[in-house]
Amino acid sequence: MKDVILRKIKNNLVVSCQAVGEETLNNDIAITLMAKACLEGGAKVLRLSQYSHIKSIKSISGKTPIIGLIKSNYENSEVIITPSIKEVDLLLSLNVDCIAIDATNRKRPSETLEVIFKYCREKSPNTLLMADCATIDDVKNADKLGFDLIGTTLRGYTKETFGKSNMDNDYSFIKECLSSIKTPLIAEGGIWEPYQVKDLLDLGCFAVVVGSAITRPKEITKYFLKALDN
């Protein structure tokens, strides 16, 4: 089962279709229509967040592989992406193909990353696990733990990596990751141009995730206006 899903993800564009908080598209109908439009455009894999959004989108997505996560805010932790077993259980109940988990070395609200990983493996051994990382140490640790996929998702989103991008210095961080691990690497974060997707696949990335540049109209508009200002 895992191999079938991995084959569907390999060498593909993964479209991240998410909306949280005060974002205009943060309702089930809007985000489902956005996902439907992406599927009509040819998207073969979706990365989705939030229980009700995933449940709604699954009703129209057929056999499209879904990488699922739940963003939750806890007062005692900066970890937001699937931070505890509580979120894991919700995702397992949705039967997503892959669960994305924050795999940074930051303090978690309850269970450690190792405990969550073990829980997932025991509870649902056929569900893929993706480690969302920010640093090379995160990446190496996720590789050691045995994650099925490792993503560069959180590069630039932690205090340690603030101001850094996966696109810096001709993809130097991506290249370092690729040379350091055997686990399939998914490039994610800061990707705004089609040529970058091709570059990253040519470098050896297993797949590439694009979100804002496709599914966040507000950010796309700001991107174009910034170009005009420059």
Curated annotation (Swiss-Prot):
InterPro entries: Aldolase_TIM, NanE, RibuloseP-bd_barrel. CDD domains: NanE. Transmembrane segments: none annotated. Pathway: Amino-sugar metabolism; N-acetylneuraminate degradation; D-fructose 6-phosphate from N-acetylneuraminate: step 3/5. Coiled coil: none annotated. It comes from the Bacteria. The keyword Isomerase applies. It catalyses: an N-acyl-D-glucosamine 6-phosphate = an N-acyl-D-mannosamine 6-phosphate. Keywords: Carbohydrate metabolism, Isomerase. Pfam families: NanE. One of its GO terms (biological process) is N-acetylmannosamine catabolic process. GO terms for cellular component: cytosol. Signal peptide: none annotated. The keyword Isomerase applies. One of its GO terms (molecular function) is N-acylglucosamine-6-phosphate 2-epimerase activity. Its EC number is 5.1.3.9. Converts N-acetylmannosamine-6-phosphate (ManNAc-6-P) to N-acetylglucosamine-6-phosphate (GlcNAc-6-P). Belongs to the NanE family. This is Putative N-acetylmannosamine-6-phosphate 2-epimerase. It comes from Malacoplasma penetrans (strain HF-2) (Mycoplasma penetrans). The lineage of its organism: Bacteria, Bacillati, Mycoplasmatota, Mycoplasmoidales, Mycoplasmoidaceae. The gene is nanE.
